[in-house]
Amino acid sequence: IPDAQLERLYNTNLFFCLFYSAGITLDTEELVLVTSRSPRYYVSAAYWDRDSLLWSFPTVVDADPALARRMLDYVFGRQRRNLGVHSRYIDGTVLEPGFELDELMAPVLALERYVGATGDRDCLEDNAIRSGLTDILRTLRTNRHRSIALYETFLQPTDDVRSYPYLTYDNVLVWKALR
């Protein structure tokens, strides 16, 4: 990066993404993703697809593709049964209910980014990933408008209940994931 200030900012973000967005559990030594490992964050050690996959994952893919692959295994494994639910514990159970379209699309967008960055198309044959994508498409169909290609959400990306069911930001994520 030619700009020293920008490089410093990138490296700070990289450090956070590598060391604060994931950890190893003490009991099972399993990789888990979290909103943040920092005790200063108001929801530390919970799991949100958006935070892990739309915010941290792009940097992790650039810096450590092997870790990025393990992150996808966790998402499409441990977290798969509640994809699209607002927030979850690290074992995949629901912490705070409520459907969020951006949370549902985050695994698809992360997978697309991973394959594009690494060229690893073998991951697309993984049974857990294939099942997860099938689950996501099924959930997406149940939230589609009956006559136009818009998809409904219950919670906004701000985690507040939405005033209108069809949000532009969320539907752009659907468009990007399905193109």
Place the predicted regions along the sequence by residue.
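A structural signal for well-ordered alpha-helices, especially hydrophobic packing surfaces
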Residues: 17, 111, 137, 178-179
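Aromatic-rich carbohydrate-recognition surfaces in CAZymes
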Residues: 42-146, 171
